[in-house]
């Protein structure tokens, strides 16, 4: 453990925005410390998509969790083979009688954006962070990962949602009202129901406790087998309590409002300019951090400029897109500079229909819906038809789309389910994909069946007032390598099947914004059909339901708004039944906590029903990008869940770009 400086070296707000201007400058802490990489190594990369936030306690998106992954340590972590090991906790114990995990913490410090020690990390920092996540005002996207598993968390969070509704005069779409009396009791009055009252719930009722500075306990709602894996994810990270209290919703909006206790600290962040993380010499494991400075430089044309800068040796990594891959591999000067990213097995891709193409006001989110030019009313009628959706399910050839990013071996990435193989197994060691009705799912692509479903849907759609061709708006993020090309081959392939003999659909490809794409497009309902992805947060099939499940009246994870379309009354009949049966199946599966086999079968049956009713169309696993990189990613942390794969701890910056043969040797040697 590095020698500790005295704790409390700076007040909570000494580095707050507007109070200190030196953050991000030269840091005395980065020039010396407990360990050095020996070569003063740096790692520079371009980025072309602006994160909407750096707040690791509230975000859930890929780019925005980089700071949480690299600058804040977790209780446990993983090695490069996926084996769990000590993190901020040196040991932990489970008491099945009280459903309580106890963690014993090591000595560690918080540092500011200059690398200067602020205070020691204590168990209270985990408590304060969890309270922040459970505060409705901050709209934490991962709050469900806390309310589902920590005793008392759901009651606490729900009460404060109702209290906020009462204080702000919220009236739900169905007419439900909220009032609060002088003692804090909230009354919720729904139409045709007796009023329900909710007494105040203090945070002391939530099952997280700082027993002392170095002892932390979590009390669970049930014996949840995936809890330890959940700890290596955003909502269970610590945060310095006094900083949270001072900054509130401005926490982690800049380098100045972010404290770090991980392998790196956030030294500078300027929107649309630069993003710098430096090695944290105070970290307990600094000897295993081999990069001194990580610099991300904003460049709106990174996909074009990055490879050219690689040729000049100006940056350390760039994605080699499919449009230039062949030329790089055939050129003697670049062929040995091309390798691949490490496969990320926890991400899967699938297509979502927009079941709520109109504007809608949730209590904590506004959806604009599809633009009029894409005929949202026509689309709403179309997706209410099961045969229409099944024509997509059976008509899409995922091999064609996957081949854009994986010219060789693309079938290795194809999936017919949402959950990937080898994700988890039941108590008998049976892979989850072999449980329940998932065991019966096979390849869907079948042109003849697709046309049968199309032909069956045409008279039904015509009777419902649908006009042809049906406009299918399909957006993509221009900052995502090859997504535009995938959309183009998708359009050509599916229209080639479904428009054979009838002008059935018109897939309209649109470019979304590079910045805040998810908030502007998917979460805003501005699409008809969209390629989406999901990364598992922990090792239990419940995590794979997050993109699809919505509680009554809730916004959910803002993917397809399945339940909202039913609640708003334009998703009806068989489709509404399929949606609500899925929601009920998930609610029942969640309640099975004493029989893992029964639990997994229940979730598997629900996932199978989601797919077989064509409420979602599976696509495949994440295809690793072709890269020119100086990093050996096989040295880095790995896990099939959470954000471990984003951590750069343990990775060296080499003096050359890695070739494919070296990549394969590194993979085999890990």
Question: Where do the PLM segments sit?
Answer:
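N-terminal lobe/hinge region of extracytoplasmic solute-binding protein
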Residues: 46-96, 259
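Append "and occasionally in soluble cytosolic enzymes with long acidic Gly/Pro-rich linkers
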Residues: 85, 278, 379-498, 605, ...
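Aromatic- and charge-enriched surface segment that lines or borders ligand/interaction sites
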Residues: 90-172, 178, 217, 306-312, ...
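Ligand/substrate-recognition segments at binding pockets and active sites
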Residues: 113, 271, 443-448, 452-537, ...
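Alpha-helical secondary-structure segments
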Residues: 123-128, 213-219, 263, 292-293, ...
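Gly/Pro-rich hinge or "lid" segments in bacterial periplasmic/extracellular proteins
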Residues: 173, 181-205, 213-214, 219-295, ...
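Extracellular/periplasmic solute-recognition and catalytic clefts
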Residues: 267-278, 295-368, 404-405
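Long beta-strand-rich cores associated with HINT superfamily self-processing modules
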Residues: 549-550, 626-670
